Amino acid sequence: MKKKIVTILCLSSLLLVACGKTTNATTIQTTNDEVITDNETATTEDSVTDSDDVDLVLDTEDGILQSNETEISAVEVEQVEPLSYQTYLEFMMSQREPNTNAIFSSESLNSAFAIYAELLDTSNKEMFKAYLRNKDYLSYKSIDGLSIINRLWVNELKDFTLTRGPLVDKDIIYMMDMSDSAQATEFKNQFVSESTNGFITETPTVFDKNTFVDAMNIIYFKSKWVGGEKTLCDGLKEFENEDGSTSQVEMFCDFGDYIAKTKTATAYKMDYENGMSFVAILPNEGYTLTDVNIDDFINNNVEYEDADVYAEFPKFEAKSTYMASFDSFNLPLNPPFKEGLTICDTEPPVISQIAKIKFDNEGTEAAAVTEIVKSDSMAMVEPKPHYDFLANRPFIYYIQDYENDDIAFMGVVSNLAD
């Protein structure tokens, strides 16, 4: 029987692209001293009103501007087109250098968006929820092998009052003194390192006296393959890099029963012990990474076919750093805060993410830290068709979080040159 060679692009909660070089990853720094509970909520006569709508108050010593609420109609909210995984994939691809590997976590970014949305006026909060498909990211659960941590870091130099809401109920608020920038930043980095088992040790964000709030999400994943360690292939295998060059690399093999195909790409899935899955999407011959629509596979627009599949995958590592603004995702550049939340709004918030992955025959370890910082400045059985799924050229991948019905990571592998 003639074997079919399938190239795969794969995406997950952590999006990864393999192309060759590895890009540096960006992370967000945070620190925490104490948790503000409902019983410990402070009050400020000058800034807290009697309105039931006032949840947060943030005062600054100088340059105070009271945000004016911008009305967004219910019709406008209903017309919001939710952010798609393809949007995140295209963002990741646009931010990386050509012929480099990359990884990105849409789950982490959306969780940070959900935290920040709790600070916004009602109409903008509802708009953000619509962009996030009205999913309750603040209720996402950690499972064996997947840790999800949310934090809202608040500068202790700013008066802050929180009376109720999910940020209080879930103990997400942490206050810290940011007057000593080096100390505050180091404390934040230590927290990140401890939360990712040392996999990510620092982020690009720096805390200082001008920092108001930092909405942070940390996601850490580590799991072995179902069935144990995969078998290494005999000898080195050739990987065709994105730029047309080739590399001799170590690969491992796998045998599966299902494969999914579209006109432009083919997907193959491998399961982890903790119940999550790694899905690789390989562009078909004649197509490239940019021809792949990841939503076709994630949204189950393509059904998996019962087949006899032989697959090969390279070991790889990737690390990526991203800096962006809200308009990078077609969101309002600087949405106003809720009434009663006094904060300097001259500078729009900045988004940063650092993501990292290690993928081999034993399993996968991956992590991402996202920050949004606001600062001043079957009958008869037919014979199964046979396919070879050889990930020996650039492919996309993602790691699926079934517990929370989301994609934890997505990425690309395009260059395995030393």
Where are the model-predicted features located?
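Non-catalytic, conformational "gating/processing" segments within enzyme and secreted inhibitor domains
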Residues: N99-T100, Y137-N284, Y304-V381
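Composition- and surface-driven signal marking solvent-exposed, interaction-prone regions
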Residues: K230-T231, D291-D296, E371, D405, ...
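Detector for small/aliphatic-rich hydrophobic stretches
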Residues: C19-M178
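Extended hydrophobic
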Residues: A215, T262, T266-I281, E382-D418
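Sec-dependent N-terminal signal peptides of Gram-positive bacterial secreted proteins and lipoproteins
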Residues: K2-T23
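Extracytoplasmic/secreted cell-surface and envelope-processing proteins
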Residues: F113, T122-F128, T288-T290, S320-Y322, ...
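Internal alpha/beta scaffold segment
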Residues: P283-E305
